[in-house]
Design a protein with these regions (language model features):
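Short helix-terminus and kink motifs of transmembrane alpha helices
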Residues: 19-31, 144-149, 194-195, 199, ...
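Transmembrane helix-loop-helix hairpins at the membrane interface
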Residues: 14-16, 162-281
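Juxtamembrane helix-loop-helix connectors linking adjacent transmembrane helices
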Residues: 107-185, 198, 203
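N-terminal, membrane-interfacial amphipathic/helix-forming hydrophobic leader that caps
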Residues: 1-131, 141, 267-281
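Generic structural marker for isolated residues within well-ordered, non-membrane alpha-helices
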Residues: 101-102, 147, 198, 242
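N-terminal start-of-chain detector that recognizes signal peptides
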Residues: 75-78, 87-89, 156-158, 191-193, ...
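Alpha-helical transmembrane segments of integral membrane proteins
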Residues: 2-10, 86-94, 127-136, 173-177, ...
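Generic detector of intrinsically disordered, low-complexity, polar/charged segments
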Residues: 49, 54-58, 114, 130, ...
């Protein structure tokens, strides 16, 4: 017989620890960015416009191509900045450990897999679920890009310091990021914020899954404090869309795939390929 209260306690513990770690990470990122800015102030300025091209008055004057941006794979770490490898290892280990704790709690409390969004239904674990997840991921990424463009056009800064700090400085680092770290993040965060906080609690207690979706999205935003206020608002909105998708489909796989694609595309497009979109003047 499922012990819902036990699993709810484990979930609450993991959430509290995650939020505490997120707060500590926010302070670390803020310090690292400040150090990096201080170091950059002593370096020659690379004048670039917001669309990624060189300003005509700067040395070089030519537009930066997508191919040339691959040089950043081997770019050295800036003085005072945390090592991308150390940051990636910290993220993977901490979130991987939290995922193991949640899964162990679900096993101990005898939580049925269906309550966590895992069943034999095609829309849960079959090819249809994979297809829906891919479509959702691509759609959310496009919406995110359009939102960023709109915010920038309105003069609202959209911070990307955390993404830059996590960007690998080698090809092997990119492989680890895309194959190891980002999948771990997607699996853990969807397991916690969608499967546990919505699926399991709605199955075990008389609580509306839509109310749980709203509350879990707030917690999801708070867990991304290192992205700044604007980033938290955007993440909260993304979290609610993923939560709604989980409620409608009942599939953990769908939201994991969508979550992974949003993160992976942001890294590959902006940091890997060096592409920056901008509205026409």
């Amino acid at each position: 017989m499922p012990r819902w209260a036990v699993f709810a306690g484990v979930t609450a513990l993991v959430l509290i620890l995650l939020l505490a770690l997120a707060r500590a990470s926010q302070l670390t990122v803020d310090g690292s960015v400040s150090s990096a800015v201080g170091a950059d102030s002593h370096q020659p300025t690379d004048h670039r416009s917001h669309d990624g091209s060189m300003d005509p008055g700067s040395n070089g004057g030519a537009t930066e191509s997508i191919e040339s941006s691959t040089a950043q794979f081997d770019a050295p770490t800036r003085p005072g900045a945390l090592s991308p490898g150390a940051l990636l290892a910290n993220v993977a280990l901490s979130q991987g450990l939290f995922a193991i704790v949640l899964l162990a709690g679900a096993w101990y409390a005898e939580i049925p897999p269906a309550a966590l969004g895992v069943s034999a239904a095609p829309l849960s674990t079959g090819p249809p679920a994979l297809g829906v997840g891919i479509a959702m991921g691509l759609g959310l990424y496009l919406v995110n890009e359009l939102g960023t463009l709109g915010a920038n056009a309105a003069g609202i800064e959209t911070p990307d310091a955390l993404r830059e700090l996590l960007t690998p400085d080698s090809r092997s680092g990119w492989l680890i990021l895309l194959v190891g770290v980002l999948p771990t993040i997607a699996v853990f965060e969807e397991l916690l914020f969608r499967a546990a906080l919505i699926g399991a609690l709605a199955a075990g207690f008389p609580i509306s899954p839509w109310l749980l979706a709203a509350l879990s999205s707030i917690a999801f935003a708070l867990g991304h404090g290192a992205q700044g206020t604007v980033g938290m608002v955007a993440t909260g909105g993304l979290g609610f869309v993923l939560a709604g998708t989980f409620v409608v489909t009942g599939s953990l796989l769908v939201v994991v795939v969508a979550h992974y694609l949003v993160n992976a595309l942001e890294f590959v497009v902006h940091e890997g390929l060096g592409v920056e979109f901008a509205l026409g003047d």
